[in-house]
Amino acid sequence: MAQGQRKFQAQKPAKSKAAAAAASARNRGPRKGGRVIAPKKARIVQQQQLKKNLEVGIRKKIEHDVVMKASTSLPKKLALLKASTKKKEASSSTKMPA
């Protein structure tokens, strides 16, 4: 039998933060929304890019129309919140050249 007190309590080795984050991401379960699998053929890549650009343009046009209609009907000026410049810079740097 051991004599005296232990100098320190035995502890498990600390896990890295990246490993802990990956483990928690795995344990979260399925996520909402569709999945996009990138195609291999260049023609299909261009078609998807065109489709995405059209969807973005249509959405922006609809948002602009709604804002204009709302601003004309309201007695007070409509103030809109713009996205921060950090997000715009990050999104522009991640775009792939066509």
From Swiss-Prot:
Residues 16-25, 73-83 have a biased composition (Low complexity). Residues 28-38 have a biased composition (Basic residues). Residues 1-38, 73-98 are annotated as: Disordered. InterPro entries: UPF0390. It comes from the Eukaryota. May have a potential role in hypercalcemia of malignancy. Belongs to the UPF0390 family. This is Leydig cell tumor 10 kDa protein homolog.
